[in-house]
A protein has these predicted regions:
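Short alpha-helical segments and helix-capping/turn motifs at coil-helix boundaries
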Residues: 94-105, 203-207, 331-335
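Core alpha/beta nucleotide-donor-binding catalytic domains of modification enzymes
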Residues: 2, 8-164, 174-178, 183
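Short, acidic Gly/Pro/Ser/Thr-rich loop/turn segments
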Residues: 122-126, 227-228, 255, 354-359, ...
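Conserved small-residue
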Residues: 9, 38, 115-118, 156, ...
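Class I S-adenosyl-L-methionine
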Residues: 105-108, 126-323
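C-terminal target-recognition/interaction regions appended to catalytic cores
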Residues: 271-423
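Short Gly/aromatic-enriched secondary-structure transition segments
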Residues: 41-42, 52, 236-237, 364-367
């Protein structure tokens, strides 16, 4: 089985399908840092499959450059990543590149089984609308509909029309349901149906599939009308883990401190083992704490104490006047928030973490800092051997925008079962 990944980001959705044995025809992504992440991950997968994983860990240890890493795998491994913005002007060239890749793989029989991905969702994201409102005013339904980003689904449909996959997966935020008073979502489903697909959607919470985070996403699945396919059955995962199970084995850090290397201070928790977040021999990377102002650390400690006392989210207005820096407190009431370490799932990871970490404060009062890239990646269920290229800010953005691999794997498992039943 193979797939094309559109608007691929850092590859969270793709990771789930790769784990279930799907082959990547192409990853199409406009962000250059995310594309480097995709290429690095493709190198990891190739080297792992060919018993040469030591070369990858040399790269993580800084003993090999990225260029040397890429040179150690066949060109076609990294050429699956297409660093181009999908637009009417570029789409023909993207098709040509994908067609050449398909021709190079006779085992695919000239066919694409699956297309996955979700266009950027900033224009109708609830978070985006809240931020817009805080600065100015709410977007009108007309503005939401007219935002050019909201028509990227038509670019997605161009790929469906070109390659006629058996099924597709279209992912987005819950805000897509209500954008333009529901008109936008209705148009999307109609468009899919005109291409010969039956479609269904569900709101899925990643916390039901092993991710220690409440992260709701709309997952549309489509299948060719004449087929026997249907919306995949997803098996929920029951557990008694807490968020601390992905934090407590990592070295404790003060703000500005680096904890990378080979050693961790704690034992592997059952969660880390069950979901292969941390493997024996992994190299710890990207565990570097941001510098923090002393005032912010004092705020963090108050927030942590309030949570530890009675699970209260302390509001900005409740802080002593000496710690407040904003005259207008209404829009900053929830500016600071604790990662709920003793709960089975924390609040939703968002890309804003790239700007500051106030909304993701580590629950350990002795550290009193915002979380690191590696901690954010674990909250999203990325394994420790997943390296995010482009520096800390770029890494946080990629992680905050990603589909958690464990959610993606649950979807992939359900779809794979249908393909196997056909054989």
């Amino acid at each position: 089985m193979n797939y094309i990944d559109l608007f691929a980001g850092a590859g969270g959705l793709s990771e789930g399908f790769r784990r279930q044995g799907f082959d990547a025809v192409a990853h199409v992504e406009m962000n250059s840092n995310a594309c480097m992440t995709l290429k690095t991950r493709a190198c990891y997968q190739y080297l792992q499959e060919h018993g040469q994983i030591g070369q990858y860990y040399q790269y993580l240890r800084g003993l090999m450059t990225r260029e040397q890493l890429y040179a150690n795998v066949p060109n076609e491994v990294t050429e699956s990543v297409i660093n181009v913005e999908i637009s009417p002007e570029t789409i023909t060239g993207i098709f040509d590149t994908i067609d050449r890749r398909i021709e190079q793989h006779p085992e695919w029989n000239g066919h694409v089984d699956l297309i996955i991905g979700g266009p950027p969702c900033q224009a109708y994201s609830m978070m985006g609308r809240a931020a817009k409102s805080a600065k100015d005013r709410d977007l009108t339904p007309e503005e939401i509909i007219e935002d050019p980003r909201n028509f990227l689904y038509k670019m997605y449909c161009r790929f469906l029309r070109k390659y006629h996959p058996d099924m597709f997966v279209f992912e987005n935020v819950p805000g897509i349901l209500t954008a333009g008073k529901g008109k936008y979502f209705t148009n999307i489903k109609k468009y899919f149906r005109t291409l010969g697909y039956e479609v269904q959607h569900r709101e899925l919470n990643s916390s039901c599939y092993g991710v220690l985070q409440n992260r709701k996403r709309i997952i549309i699945v489509g299948w060719q009308r004449e087929s026997n396919h249907h919306y995949p059955e997803l098996e929920a995962i029951e557990h008694d883990y807490s968020v601390n199970d992905i934090l407590n084995d990592l070295p404790k850090l003060a703000p500005g401190q680096v904890g990378n290397g080979y050693r961790r201070t704690g034992q592997l928790s059952p969660y880390l083992q069950q979901f292969h977040i941390r493997e024996i021999g992994d190299v710890l990377t990207q565990h570097e704490a941001r510098p923090q102002l002393d005032r912010d650390r004092r705020i963090y400690r108050k927030m942590i104490r309030a949570w530890n006392s009675d699970h209260t989210y302390m509001k900005y207005n409740d802080l002593p006047r000496s710690l407040k820096v904003y005259k207008e407190t209404k829009n900053f009431a929830d500016r600071f928030k604790i990662v709920e370490g003793d709960m089975p799932a924390c609040h939703t990871m968002i890309a804003h973490i790239a700007k500051d970490g106030h909304y993701f404060i580590h629950p350990d009062i002795s550290q009193a800092r915002s979380i690191t890239v590696r901690e954010a990646a674990r909250i999203q269920s990325f394994p420790d051997n997943y390296y995010f290229e482009g520096g800390r800010t770029a890494a946080f953005t990629q992680i905050g925008n990603a589909v958690p691999p464990l959610l993606a794997e649950a979807i992939a498992r359900g779809i794979l079962q249908q393909f196997q039943e056909e054989e």
